[in-house]
Amino acid sequence: MEKRIGTFYGVSVGPGNPELMTLQAVRRLENCPVIAAPQTPKGGMLALDIAKGAVELSGKTILPLRFAMSLDPAVQKAAHIEAARAVKEYLDAGQDVAMLNLGDVSVYATFGYLQEILEAEGCKTVMLPGVTSFCAAAARLGQSLTGGMEQPLTIAPGRCAAEVLAAPGAKVLMKSGRQLPETLAALADAGLLSWSAMVCNCGLPNEEVWPDLADYDPARSAGYFATILVKEG
């Protein structure tokens, strides 16, 4: 009899509010025996906390995944390999593993690194889509991301602001918290501060909404999960 190998699922949990999780995500987590979730150096597991607001996870195996915050590609790669190895132990034992991902699993998600490693080793992977932080932020602000059916939309990390602001259409600058002073300076240089809004920690208890970044103090710190929406000027 052929040995069963588990499936590795990338499950999107949305930006913060558990009510934004899809039915597909909830059902997959209900049926998956092993739940893998990123863990910060201080032990925080935000994606797991969000999932617990929608799914009863008691009795399941929780697999913490620790990813390096270093900008060194070699250090990052080593962390991805170690995490993939931990996941594969359960897959080889015939157990499905669901990895929780903030926002949508296809957008700046760590799942993709593990997916590449595990697929190269013959493992089956499945991605379950979800609500992105920038779509939730747009809804929170009550604004459309695209003013018309023909308007382009550019999505980039906040550190790339200076490179993409000249592009036509609206822009989404994700994970902008770390480089916020530089991002605000780029917006100011382009004359787009008043055309820009920011939502920090969208859907979480510590959510902050700034409809006009011209009113934002550049010296004020913003969290890692800061999403900036820039209308076409």
Specify the residue positions occupied by each region the protein language model found.
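A contiguous loop/helix-start segment that scaffolds small-molecule binding in enzyme catalytic cores
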Residues: 8, 97, 165-233
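Structural signal for conserved beta-strand scaffold positions within catalytic alpha/beta enzyme cores
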Residues: 37, 63-66, 127, 147, ...
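Short beta->alpha linker loops
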Residues: 46, 102, 129-132, 159, ...
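Short, surface-exposed amphipathic charged segments that create phosphate/polyanion-binding patches used
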Residues: 75-83, 140-143, 167-170, 209-216
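Class I S-adenosyl-L-methionine
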Residues: 1-18, 23-124, 218, 223-227, ...
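Short gly/pro/ser/thr-enriched loop/turn and capping motifs at secondary-structure boundaries
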Residues: 42-44, 70, 132-135, 204-206
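Class I SAM-dependent methyltransferase SAM-binding "motif I" and its flanking Rossmann-like core
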Residues: 106-167, 219
